[in-house]
A protein has these predicted regions:
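N-terminal polybasic/positive-inside topogenic patches
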Residues: 5-11, 15-17
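N-terminal presequence-like segments and the immediate start of the first folded domain
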Residues: 14-118, 122-141, 146-201
């Protein structure tokens, strides 16, 4: 078999003749090699991507969860979901003084941020078909439904960042990030996260 090297690797026309299929497989890996690498990692970690969000009937969503433009994917704000697509609790403000039924601990909010990450990955999978097509996590904006005076928003959104870095590694997964406290979030969610990623489409 004759292989023409891509232009950027040539100084002058160069052709290599390869007859051994094993050698050929190392020179030109199959498109299926390492296919679904990210989903394999998810399975190894015992994590499951949720079904599409089951939006409450009284909530209108005149927008798309993921918008592709060129090699960028703009991702709308996602909250935590259960595997069946329903909105995941607990609900209410994160932190605060008195312990109340509607309050959310930092540990619970960290887990909610992780679930929001899985929600985003689920939307990306439905849009791209393969999570391996994400070639870089560029920017993340995390919003925390913070009680008055709560300052541990960074600890909360680390739940998302830790997940992405575990799955994609620092080369692709390291991102610019904001973690801000807000007065309220839709449906009383403890966290909502939006992102900008680079994709290969």
């Amino acid at each position: 078999m004759c292989i023409a090297l891509p232009y950027k690797y040539r100084i002058a026309p160069l052709y290599i003749y390869v007859e051994d299929k094993d050698v050929l497989s190392h020179i030109m890996p199959s498109k299926d090699d390492n296919a679904n690498r990210i989903e394999t990692k998810l399975n190894t970690l015992g994590l499951k991507l949720p079904e599409p969000l089951k939006v409450p009937t009284n909530v209108k969503t005149p927008f798309t969860w993921v918008r592709i433009s060129g090699n960028k994917a703009y991702i709308s704000g996602h909250g935590p979901q259960n595997p069946d697509g329903s909105v995941a609790g607990p609900f209410g403000k994160v932190g605060g003084g008195a312990v109340g039924e509607s309050e959310v601990s930092v540990a619970q909010a960290y887990q909610a941020a992780k679930l929001a990450g899985l929600s985003i990955l689920g939307s990306l999978k439905r849009e791209l078909g393969n999570l391996d097509l994400v070639t870089g996590w560029l920017q993340v904006r995390g919003m925390v439904n913070a009680a008055a005076g709560f300052t541990q928003t960074t600890d909360v959104i680390n739940g998302f960042s830790d997940l992405i870095l575990t799955l994609y590694g620092p080369e692709l997964g390291m991102h610019a990030r904001s973690a801000i406290g807000v007065q309220a979030l839709p449906l009383g969610l403890p966290v909502i996260i939006e992102a900008l990623v680079e994709v290969s489409v």
